[in-house]
C-alpha cells in the first residue's frame, strides 16, 4: 500500500521551494547595485527609482517624471527628457549625453557612464560601477547629488 501523505508532503515542499526561488529572482531584478571602483557595494537603485545606501536605508527617490527627491520627499532636482539635470530651482547643473558623457553646467566633461555600467571621471579613471542602472540615474548618484 502506497502512503499518499509522503507524496503530499513532497508536493508541498516543492511548492515552497518554487515560491522561494521566484521571490529570490524578484529581489534580484528589483534593485541594481551601486559599487565603488573596488566593487564594494555603496548602495542600490531599485527599479522604481528608490535610492538606498548599502544598509538598504532609503536615501532618495527618482520619480518616473524625472523628479529627484531626498529621503523626506523634498524635491532636490529634475532629470529632463533631453538629459539635462536641474537643481530644485530649475537651474541646470549638468547634462547626460546619449553617448554617456557627463557634463557640468558649462558643458565641460566631468565623467562618463559606459554601456557596461562602469562610471569614470573626466580622466577615464574608474570611480564606480552602476550595472544596469539607467545612465541618467547613475549620473545623478555619482556626479550631481549626494544621498548620504
Which residues fall in each region the model found?
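Positively charged n-region of N-terminal signal peptides that target proteins for export
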Residues: 2-4, 8-17
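Short helix-onset patch at the extreme N-terminus, typifying the N->h transition
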Residues: 7-8, 20-21, 36
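Sec-dependent N-terminal signal peptides
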Residues: 17-26
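Sec/Tat signal peptide C-region and signal peptidase I cleavage site
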Residues: 27-31
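Intrinsically disordered, low-complexity proline/glycine-rich segments
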Residues: 32-148
Amino acid at each position: 500500500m502506497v502512503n499518499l501523505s509522503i507524496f503530499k508532503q513532497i508536493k508541498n515542499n516543492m511548492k515552497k521551494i518554487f515560491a522561494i526561488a521566484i521571490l529570490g529572482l524578484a529581489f534580484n531584478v528589483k534593485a541594481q547595485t551601486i559599487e565603488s571602483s573596488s566593487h564594494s557595494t555603496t548602495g542600490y537603485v531599485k527599479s522604481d527609482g528608490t535610492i538606498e545606501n548599502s544598509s538598504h536605508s532609503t536615501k532618495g527617490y527618482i520619480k518616473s517624471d524625472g523628479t529627484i527627491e531626498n529621503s523626506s520627499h523634498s524635491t532636490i532636482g529634475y532629470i529632463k527628457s533631453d538629459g539635462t539635470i536641474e537643481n530644485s530651482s530649475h537651474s541646470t547643473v549638468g547634462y547626460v549625453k546619449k553617448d554617456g558623457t557627463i557634463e557640468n553646467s558649462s558643458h565641460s566633461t566631468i565623467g562618463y557612464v559606459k554601456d557596461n555600467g562602469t562610471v569614470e571621471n573626466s580622466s577615464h579613471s574608474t570611480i564606480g560601477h552602476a550595472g544596469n542602472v539607467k545612465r541618467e540615474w547613475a549620473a545623478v548618484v555619482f556626479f550631481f547629488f549626494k544621498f548620504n
